Amino acid sequence: MIYIDNRQNSITVDENLQNTIREVIDYALKEEGMKISYEVSVIFVDNETIREINRENREVDKVTDVLSFPMLEYGEGKVFKDIYEECDFEDEYFDEGNLVLGDIALSLERAEEQSKEYGHSFLREAAYLTVHSVLHLMGYDHMVDEDKIKMRKREEEILSHFDINR
């Protein structure tokens, strides 16, 4: 189950955008080994709102493009597909039979700005940021170079399925 909640007025949210976000999330999760029903919540926000969320949750008082709030914890250097087969998730991780993976806050305003900066479509930028965030929900990180390389490679592999390349 993918919930999308539009909490901004800066960018028009049409059916194509919502469908693309849903398809990208579903495909990325399946590629990462998701074999059971899941739940991901996505909120579309503006720059000021994502700045507030960033400040409240990370103590970073600046605008960012996307924030991920994973519900599951993974061991150091582990991602979902590394632990899924041996993991017995407790009831607290489920809601109505769906494994709750976490929340994504996506600034559509910042995605629009970045699409212009990088010279590609808004839809491509929104899709990229969604894949990036989903991978965080699945345990990927980019704090050290080795992990960053692994994550970037995975992002591009997933996006290539949609013919949405950089």
Curated annotation (Swiss-Prot):
InterPro entries: MetalPrtase_cat_dom_sf_prd, YbeY, YbeY_CS. Pfam families: YbeY. Its main location: cytoplasm. The keyword Hydrolase applies. Keywords: Cytoplasm, Endonuclease, Hydrolase, Metal-binding, Nuclease, Ribosome biogenesis, rRNA processing, Zinc. Binds 1 zinc ion. It is found in: Cytoplasm. Belongs to the endoribonuclease YbeY family. HAMAP family: Endoribonucl_YbeY. This is Endoribonuclease YbeY. It comes from Clostridium acetobutylicum (strain ATCC 824 / DSM 792 / JCM 1419 / IAM 19013 / LMG 5710 / NBRC 13948 / NRRL B-527 / VKM B-1787 / 2291 / W).
